[in-house]
Amino acid sequence: MERRGSLWLFSVLCFGIAILYIPILVLIGYSFNASPLVNVWGGFSTTWYSQLWHNRQLLEAAWLSLEVAVSSSTGAVVLGTLAAVALVRFARFPGRLLLTGMVSAPLVMPEIITGITQLLLFVAMMQLLSWPHRGFTTIVISHVTFCTAYVTITVQARLASADRSLEEAAMDLGAHPARAFLEITLPIIAPAIVSSWLLCFTLSLDDLVISSFVSGPGASTLPMVIYSKVKLGVSPDVNALASLIVCAVGVVILSAGWLMGRAERRRRLETQLAEQ
């Protein structure tokens, strides 16, 4: 009975993995399709990869999306980590409940509501301060707003489970609290920070709804360009670009996982040596 249950769970796991990754493999396969029809196989060809470099609209949108994703992920990681430290290390302070609610709100708020409220905010700020102009800046600010919540929740969970006695021991030996945090606590929560950055990068790169509200003329992200092309039919060079992005993201994730695993093994070894 137990073996049958394990086999059933394994089958469900394989089915879920197939649903996730077979469409990606099909997309990569059709990026080498010689036919201009995206769903009709016409032979193997790399034509669409060569034509991709001449599609200025797609390349500019992809570059803008990467700039937005990197900028917003970095900003969200900084703000989210600081918020997580405040919530974990300072159990009681005025406005803690309000801060917790503000951090959690973007997680449950529909994207269309977030987009509308951000648009109204930027319009009001433009009328009062003549800043910011709708475009790259407004997209980054909006993405930082909803990505910070994911960083805070992730880092807060890791920080709450960290052994604070190590940091206290460092301070007892004369280390400044800031130095103790940077050299003791920060390496412990580094995997959570890196994971949060990758999550925010993916969310920002994939966002369509919020970006559509807060973007301006000449600031179309890649999801916006692809969505506009869907109405007329997706060209095969979109498959080529998507394949390149999938491969690049895969390399980044594997590299980050290897680096985090290496750092974790080194930290465990140093801890064992210190205990001996």
Residues covered by each model-derived region:
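Cytoplasmic-entry segments and transmembrane alpha-helices of multi-pass inner-membrane transporters
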Residues: 5-13, 82-118, 167, 274-275
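Membrane-interfacial helix termini and adjacent extracytoplasmic/periplasmic loops
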Residues: 37-42, 46, 95, 112-146, ...
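Transmembrane alpha-helices
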Residues: 12-24, 151-156, 162-163, 177-206
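C-terminal transmembrane helix and the adjacent membrane-cytosol boundary/short C-terminal tail
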Residues: 2-11, 19, 86, 95, ...
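Transmembrane-helix boundary motif in ABC transporter permease subunits
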Residues: 1-6, 70-103, 124, 254-261
